[in-house]
Amino acid sequence: MREGRWRRWWPLAAAAALVVLLAATNAVPTWPGLIHLVALPPLDQFADLRFLLSRAPSWPVFLVLFAAVAAARVALMAWLLGGLDARRLRFAALFYTVTFGPVLLAAFADATAYAVLYSRLFWPAVALVGILVLTLGPVPWQGTVRLRVALALTWRRGLRVEVLVPYCAVVLALGAVAERIPALTVPLVPVSAVATGLAIRAMHRPAMRRPGAALSAFVAALVAASIVFVATRGYEEPEPGPPQPGSLLILSGINSASGRGAIHATDIHRLGYTCEQVYYFSYAGPGDGQPQRDATCPIRTGAPYGPSDTQRPFQEQVDLFVEQASGLPRPLVVAAHSHAVWVVWEAVATGRVEVDALLLVGPFPSTPTGYPPPGVNQPGRVFADLLRLAAPATDLVRFHFDPETPAARELLGTAGAAESVLARPLPGAVRASSLPSATDLPLMPDGRELDVERNECPARVAHPYLPKSAAFEDATIRFLNGRPPPPCPPWRDWGAVLVRPFGVPAGQALR
């Protein structure tokens, strides 16, 4: 009996041993998602595609490795279903074929989010994978090798939530441990394989008596948790701050335009400034003024600019900032959103312009992955080609992105570019605060903190809306007036810890 049981499970144990060996020899990066390589389908397929998209150095290598891995996945599933006969092999191949499309879409969105630092792609990718795992994860283990019958049985048995929900909780917990304690990542691979085996074994047992009720209860709990999450993320508007001396220079981020950027709509009056004290940076250079549009105040200086101007070479942007910031009334406070953080930091850290305080809104401490130039065989070649192919689709959501513009190539396409900028310390006399968005935290594999006076508690506000949020206003008023920040809940970054293992290999894991 024991020999028969071992005979069934040894391929899963061998797969775990192979993953451990590959990680130990640096053939695959040791990132928290490593544990997903021995997870239930289709999470295992998601891990395969994340790794291959981000690390395959050429199309031939990608295709050969994908074919080999796909064949191994099909054989492993067939064996776990009972043996390598034609019917089980055909079932496994059909299952992975059905899941390939949505899983590839999720993996590509995942890799894109890390490459272009756009969390609005990351969260839908994770949600899609979660839906696929919960709805399709039980399908192969329903005791039949006919896919349609297996799908029907899965739904009739309530998606086996009594097995899948605890299993998913274990996977999330293992990923969180690997994220917090990287040294345990490789030892956790066999643990993940054991969890997978136990889940498969549990799904071969009879389902609950009332599976529909269990599924309904799970959906109700999920909806209730979502409502609570949304209802508790608001911030109370702070009391207006006292009048501030000097001037405030505001810089919008990438793909903005004159008067068209979230930071243009910042309530500068609540911060303690008047319109006569406020200046708006132009990516087109000095001029006699720009269209006001969404800006709180008339824009009296700078030339009108559009999204294409924000894509000019990085050093040109730094030069323009130096030119427009020099000579403004002191004390000079600079508020920079997103991409503009790197521009401002470069100018101030190199001593090219003198400022008194920096408000860094939605900064990214690193560019964790990058992507190779066209036609260059380097890790990420396949992903980069797909990114360039998909780039025109960004116009449909009014977020034009061209991965080969000078700014994108220098900062996003080059892994470590942001780190090299932010590695230079600011002058000692410059006060600075950093306010990240909690939704961006998964894209910061090496941490969110900058070398500044105050690293604010991550705000539960989406990245684009951060500069006009009550969270930013409160943090800024406190910082400018020397008041301490409110306590930061220890759970504020727990979401990022739980989901970061669903990202691509990035940051320190690649180094």
Feature-to-residue mapping (PLM):
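Membrane-anchoring hydrophobic segments
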Residues: 1-144
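Catalytic active-site module of serine/aspartate enzymes centered on a nucleophile-bearing elbow/loop
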Residues: 48-54, 460-511
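Membrane-interfacial entry segments at the cytosolic side of transmembrane helices
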Residues: 85-92, 154-159, 207-221
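Cytosolic-side transmembrane helix boundary signature
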Residues: 179-222
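Active-site catalytic motif of lipid deacylating hydrolases and related acyltransferases
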Residues: 246-330, 365, 374-377
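The conserved beta1-alpha1 loop
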Residues: 249-255, 336-338, 362, 436
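Serine-dependent carboxylesterase/thioesterase catalytic core
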Residues: 315-411
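Short beta-strand/loop motif that positions the catalytic acidic residue
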Residues: 427-428, 434-440
